[in-house]
């Protein structure tokens, strides 16, 4: 089983977008991005999506042909992003639609993906912001 913790934000909303993520398996950290900057004009939700996409893309590449059998648990504090990728909520903002499609496309390449909300304090504890 693989676990992803992701978080993103924006200084200004929209403003300077940034994000981070951690990918673990069996308690071992496989990949950790502490701060990836996404440039100006980025909203909080776009930054959240970009962090999730970065983590899913990294894990997909890391696993290669084995991705289709992998179980992945994704944890984040963005209810909007998590509910949209689960299909529980519609994507009403056209600016988020490309990010949503990319995240779903990546998630569909794994055997099983569960999207779980956690409190912001868990993101801070794991990712440092």
List PLM regions with ranges:
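Short, conserved alpha-helix that lines the donor NDP-sugar binding/gating region
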Residues: 48, 52
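RNase H-like nuclease fold core
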Residues: 1-46, 57-61
């Amino acid at each position: 089983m693989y676990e992803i913790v992701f978080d993103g934000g924006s200084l200004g909303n929209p403003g300077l977008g940034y994000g981070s993520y951690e990918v673990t398996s069996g308690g071992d950290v496989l990949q950790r991005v502490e701060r990836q900057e996404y440039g100006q004009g980025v909203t909080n939700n776009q930054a959240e999506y970009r962090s999730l996409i970065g983590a899913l893309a990294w894990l997909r590449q890391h696993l290669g042909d084995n991705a289709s059998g992998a179980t992945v648990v994704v944890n984040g504090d963005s209810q909007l992003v998590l509910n949209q990728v689960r299909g529980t909520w519609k994507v009403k903002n056209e600016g988020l639609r490309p990010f949503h499609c990319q995240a779903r496309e990546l998630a569909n390449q794994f055997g099983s993906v569960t999207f779980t909300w956690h409190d912001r304090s868990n993101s801070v504890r794991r990712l440092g912001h």
